[in-house]
Each structure stands twice: as C-alpha cells, then as structure tokens.
C-alpha cells in the first residue's frame, strides 16, 4: 500500500493529496491512503512493513516546512521523533522524502536531509528502513507533472528540476522524471 503524508496542514497540500488519490484510483484501481498532520495518528498506525510512505512537504537541504517561509518546519531529527511518537511501525522499509533537495548534502561536512533522517530513525530502532531523497526541485502537483517520451506510456510522472550540483543541463529549468534523480540511504 502507498501512503502519502503531508506533515503540515494547509489547503494546498490537501488539494494535491486529494488529486493524487483520485488519479491513482482511476488509473490503477488502487486507492492510496492520503492524510495530513491532523490525521497522522490514525493513519500512521496502519502502515505495515512492506508499505511505502511518502513524506510530502516543501523543503531544502536543512529541513522540511510549511510553505515557502518555513515558519513551521522540521529538522530530520524532529521528523523522526514525530513519526516515532505517532507509533509508525519499526518494520517499515521504505520512506521517501518527497521535498526539494532532500537528497543533496547540506554542506561538505553535513549529509543530506534524507541521510540525517535515516540516521535519526536508526537511533530510534528503525533497522530495516531505506530512505529516498531527491536531487533537485520536485513537483508533486498533477498540474506540473510530465509524461514520458514513450508513446505507449501516457502516465503523468512526478517531476524534478535537477540541482546544478548533480546535473549540468543546457536547458535551464527543464523538468525530468523524479525517479531519475533520487538517492537511497
């Protein structure tokens, strides 16, 4: 089962999650579970070890936040502690931090948000976990999704503008398929 969790409550996230839920149900017949912070206690307790949990938020190499001003934000350790307190199963093996630059090093001596989150989760007893971070500006909204160039594949994919640190591109701001620019820890 796929779970989409937005750890900050706002109308933009709610509408994007609802759009994703309806789209996937129509296309695949499988309805993912989508929820926001105010529903997290209810839904995180349902996640099983084989499930995939997407954390959907605005972000940068330092943290994830609510909107572009990050007045309400979480560090990797704060996010890990929040999931632990909400009783996320320690059997989970796949969490994807779908936020901008979550897989890019913060600095030469400080690992990426995704790697620091994985380390925080390991310290809380999540031993089977693989965490995915993304290497650029990600797009979750279906309005900004792209299609693969293959004629037979009309699915709209999560998009990403790769960070210049990762990929030098002659076409500035060209959007690629997000799964092409991710890193796993």
Walk through the language-model features, giving the residues of each.
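Catalytic-core segments of thiol-dependent peptidases
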Residues: 2-106
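Active-site-proximal C-terminal subdomain of hydrolase catalytic domains
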Residues: 95-185
